[in-house]
Amino acid sequence: MHQSIDTAIGLNLLHANQAGADHNRAHFDEWGITCLNLMSSPGAGKTVLLEKTLAALQSELKMAVIEGDMTTELDADRLRQYGSPVIAINTGRSCHLDAKMVAGGIHRLQEDYNPKEFDLVLVENVGNLVCPAEFEVGEHSKVALLSVTEGEDKPLKYPVMFQEADCLLITKTDLIPHLDIDLEKLAANVRSMNPHVTIIPVSAKTGEGLDTWFSWVKSQVKVPMIVSI
């Protein structure tokens, strides 16, 4: 009985969140913004990837960041150095951002900026391999990060995030010489559950794969149609 009640409550929460996510996405679509949701376990490299992305693409794209952490604005402060607006959201005990939280972030962005000026909103979700994948926030694409130190079996143990991802970044590849890891096996494990995912090995330290990542990001951004009169 209790299990049935818990299941019903969980489904209601997911349904309500999905409605909120659809509402957020409708706003993004109205404004011509692409939203990417970055997800990973803690320490996989989301923040440093965003630093590299903001630095590399700021002359080409107008970007904003919604930065999720349980507490502090440490990561948000790091990202603010690159000049793009960064909205920090502290989730408290929650292990993920949800659509309502991100809606609040959108409203805060609207207070100081015209959202139609932006091309891209990058959401850095709370570090967790499970919860963020189950709660959409209004994104157009999900980006998962997995560091080589986590092993090639992680996608099999925590499948939902890797099943949902549109792009997987295998991070910290500069550490491979010091580890016993098989990248081909890792990629095969991911493709066994998500055959169409884009997989990009990257190293923020050496720069490996970053240009490929930047190209993928730009390929996702909505390009306004120019109508000739």
Swiss-Prot record:
<feature type="binding site">
    <location>
        <position position="131"/>
    </location>
    <ligand>
        <name>Zn(2+)</name>
    </ligand>
</feature>
<comment type="similarity">
    <text>Belongs to the SIMIBI class G3E GTPase family. HypB/HupM subfamily.</text>
</comment>
<dbReference type="GO" id="GO:0008270">
    <property type="term" value="F:zinc ion binding"/>
</dbReference>
<dbReference type="GO" id="GO:0051604">
    <property type="term" value="P:protein maturation"/>
</dbReference>
<keyword id="KW-0378">Hydrolase</keyword>
<feature type="region of interest" description="G-domain">
    <location>
        <begin position="35"/>
        <end position="200"/>
    </location>
</feature>
<keyword id="KW-0533">Nickel</keyword>
<dbReference type="InterPro" id="IPR027417">
    <property type="entry name" value="P-loop_NTPase"/>
</dbReference>
<keyword id="KW-0479">Metal-binding</keyword>
<keyword id="KW-0342">GTP-binding</keyword>
<dbReference type="InterPro" id="IPR003495">
    <property type="entry name" value="CobW/HypB/UreG_nucleotide-bd"/>
</dbReference>
<feature type="binding site">
    <location>
        <position position="95"/>
    </location>
    <ligand>
        <name>Ni(2+)</name>
    </ligand>
</feature>
<protein>
    <recommendedName>
        <fullName>Guanidine hydrolase-activating protein B</fullName>
    </recommendedName>
</protein>
<dbReference type="GO" id="GO:0016151">
    <property type="term" value="F:nickel cation binding"/>
</dbReference>
<comment type="function">
    <text>Involved in the maturation of the nickel-dependent guanidine hydrolase GdmH. Required for nickel insertion into the metal center of GdmH. Seems to be required only for GdmH activation and not for activity.</text>
</comment>
<dbReference type="GO" id="GO:0003924">
    <property type="term" value="F:GTPase activity"/>
</dbReference>
<feature type="binding site">
    <location>
        <position position="131"/>
    </location>
    <ligand>
        <name>Ni(2+)</name>
    </ligand>
</feature>
<keyword id="KW-0547">Nucleotide-binding</keyword>
<feature type="binding site">
    <location>
        <position position="96"/>
    </location>
    <ligand>
        <name>Ni(2+)</name>
    </ligand>
</feature>
<dbReference type="GO" id="GO:0005525">
    <property type="term" value="F:GTP binding"/>
</dbReference>
<feature type="binding site">
    <location>
        <position position="95"/>
    </location>
    <ligand>
        <name>Zn(2+)</name>
    </ligand>
</feature>
<dbReference type="Pfam" id="PF02492">
    <property type="entry name" value="cobW"/>
</dbReference>
<feature type="binding site">
    <location>
        <position position="96"/>
    </location>
    <ligand>
        <name>Zn(2+)</name>
    </ligand>
</feature>
<dbReference type="InterPro" id="IPR004392">
    <property type="entry name" value="Hyd_mat_HypB"/>
</dbReference>
<keyword id="KW-0862">Zinc</keyword>
